[in-house]
């Protein structure tokens, strides 16, 4: 947990993490019926759509009430903001008090080791160090 968060931000971050665990998966209307549809969310717009009208016994619809608190939106559960890193030089611009490093998936193992070594020297938190 990031120690520089004030009490209100810590409280909101706990709420955000609890909400994230409870949040349901939103599926597209009739995603189970046709394989070609996929399950990615699409807003129901049909004139007679039961899902659009929020009738009973229907899955939940995306709504503003499912969002996390705005003060901690975009934060990692540890309380840091993530910064995507592709090479060692990008580590210099990271603020260790508020930001944590996530190494890009396109980075190979040799460069990954260099990034991890340099981030330890700079006291940076690596989220996917392995």
Swiss-Prot record:
Taxonomic superkingdom: Archaea
Gene Ontology molecular-function annotations: structural constituent of ribosome
GO biological process: translation
Keywords: Ribonucleoprotein, Ribosomal protein
UniProt name for this protein: Large ribosomal subunit protein eL32
GO annotations of cellular component type: cytosolic large ribosomal subunit
Homology family: Belongs to the eukaryotic ribosomal protein eL32 family.
Alphabetized NCBIfam families for the sequence: PRK08562.1
Entry-linked InterPro entries: Ribosomal_eL32 (IPR001515), Ribosomal_eL32_arc (IPR023654), Ribosomal_eL32_CS (IPR018263), Ribosomal_eL32_sf (IPR036351)
